[in-house]
Swiss-Prot record:
<keyword id="KW-0443">Lipid metabolism</keyword>
<dbReference type="InterPro" id="IPR013114">
    <property type="entry name" value="FabA_FabZ"/>
</dbReference>
<comment type="similarity">
    <text>Belongs to the thioester dehydratase family. FabZ subfamily.</text>
</comment>
<keyword id="KW-0441">Lipid A biosynthesis</keyword>
<dbReference type="Pfam" id="PF07977">
    <property type="entry name" value="FabA"/>
</dbReference>
<keyword id="KW-0456">Lyase</keyword>
<dbReference type="GO" id="GO:0009245">
    <property type="term" value="P:lipid A biosynthetic process"/>
</dbReference>
<dbReference type="InterPro" id="IPR010084">
    <property type="entry name" value="FabZ"/>
</dbReference>
<dbReference type="GO" id="GO:0019171">
    <property type="term" value="F:(3R)-hydroxyacyl-[acyl-carrier-protein] dehydratase activity"/>
</dbReference>
<dbReference type="GO" id="GO:0005737">
    <property type="term" value="C:cytoplasm"/>
</dbReference>
<keyword id="KW-0444">Lipid biosynthesis</keyword>
<dbReference type="InterPro" id="IPR029069">
    <property type="entry name" value="HotDog_dom_sf"/>
</dbReference>
<protein>
    <recommendedName>
        <fullName>3-hydroxyacyl-[acyl-carrier-protein] dehydratase FabZ</fullName>
        <ecNumber>4.2.1.59</ecNumber>
    </recommendedName>
</protein>
<feature type="active site">
    <location>
        <position position="58"/>
    </location>
</feature>
<comment type="function">
    <text>Involved in unsaturated fatty acids biosynthesis. Catalyzes the dehydration of short chain beta-hydroxyacyl-ACPs and long chain saturated and unsaturated beta-hydroxyacyl-ACPs.</text>
</comment>
<dbReference type="GO" id="GO:0016020">
    <property type="term" value="C:membrane"/>
</dbReference>
<dbReference type="GO" id="GO:0006633">
    <property type="term" value="P:fatty acid biosynthetic process"/>
</dbReference>
Length: 157
């Protein structure tokens, strides 16, 4: 059957994410992915809650999601769409390689719904670079470019 006749994956729920990502609580930072366009672009969703462990110390009287976790959520979204679209049966792992041009524009707080827009801008062999934007209520809160490498279990890095 050709790829044109196959059903395209348009969304991934938490079970699909758990099947491809190695991350688990408290470091799985995306709840769902929607608007998937192959391994080219997608929108990750992170529902930010006060129950997350980083809010205990960041900051007790004014809880703010650490910027590094926003970037990690972007990277997990990019990695997940890469792994969800793999044609091989061999298990893959995504290794986060670089962060470029990261900017944080406003705080993300408990109760926010973080939308993580990722778009592939470059690929060479098993390394992909993504342009990422995070928004809350239609307002850009962060942006970055991230690069990652896919490795399979029987390959050497």
């Amino acid at each position: 059957m050709s790829d044109d006749n196959q059903t395209k994956l348009e969304a991934a729920d938490i079970q699909a994410l758990l099947a491809v990502l190695p991350h688990r609580y408290p470091f799985l930072l995306i709840d769902r992915i929607v608007d998937i366009d192959g391994d080219v672009s997608a929108t990750g969703i992170k529902n930010v809650t006060i129950n997350e462990p980083h809010f205990t110390g960041h900051f007790p009287e004014n809880p703010i999601m650490p910027g590094v976790l926003i970037v990690e959520a972007m990277a997990q979204t990019a990695g997940a769409i890469s792994l969800l679209q793999r044609k091989t049966g061999r298990p893959g792992v995504v290794y986060f390689m670089t962060i470029d041009s990261a900017k944080f524009r406003r705080p993300v707080v408990p109760g926010d719904r973080l939308l993580l827009y990722v778009k592939k801008i470059k690929q060479r062999a098993n390394i992909s670079k993504y342009e990422c934007v995070a928004e809350v209520d239609g307002v850009k809160v962060a942006e970055a470019e991230v690069a990652a490498m896919i490795s399979v279990a029987d390959e050497n890095l």
